From Swiss-Prot:
<comment type="similarity">
    <text>Belongs to the PsbE/PsbF family.</text>
</comment>
<dbReference type="InterPro" id="IPR013081">
    <property type="entry name" value="PSII_cyt_b559_N"/>
</dbReference>
<keyword id="KW-0604">Photosystem II</keyword>
<dbReference type="InterPro" id="IPR006241">
    <property type="entry name" value="PSII_cyt_b559_bsu"/>
</dbReference>
<dbReference type="InterPro" id="IPR006216">
    <property type="entry name" value="PSII_cyt_b559_CS"/>
</dbReference>
<keyword id="KW-0812">Transmembrane</keyword>
<keyword id="KW-0249">Electron transport</keyword>
<protein>
    <recommendedName>
        <fullName>Cytochrome b559 subunit beta</fullName>
    </recommendedName>
</protein>
<dbReference type="Pfam" id="PF00283">
    <property type="entry name" value="Cytochrom_B559"/>
</dbReference>
<dbReference type="GO" id="GO:0009539">
    <property type="term" value="C:photosystem II reaction center"/>
</dbReference>
<keyword id="KW-0349">Heme</keyword>
<keyword id="KW-0793">Thylakoid</keyword>
<feature type="binding site" description="axial binding residue">
    <location>
        <position position="27"/>
    </location>
    <ligand>
        <name>heme</name>
    </ligand>
</feature>
<keyword id="KW-0479">Metal-binding</keyword>
<dbReference type="GO" id="GO:0020037">
    <property type="term" value="F:heme binding"/>
</dbReference>
<keyword id="KW-1133">Transmembrane helix</keyword>
<dbReference type="GO" id="GO:0009055">
    <property type="term" value="F:electron transfer activity"/>
</dbReference>
Length: 48
């Protein structure tokens, strides 16, 4: 390791986008799922 004057510059910083196709797919499924779980949980407390 004679090349010690270059301190760890091989790692390039990558900025990833937030809104991707995967993000849209996950939230398109997760948001209604949480809504329906809340609705089903609320139905358990309805007394007739």
């Amino acid at each position: 390791m004679s090349n010690s004057q270059a301190p760890m510059q091989a790692v390039e910083v990558r900025v990833y986008p937030i809104f991707t196709v995967r993000w849209l797919a996950v939230h398109a499924l997760a948001i209604p799922s949480v809504f329906f779980l809340g609705a089903i949980a609320a139905m358990q407390f309805i007394s007739r």
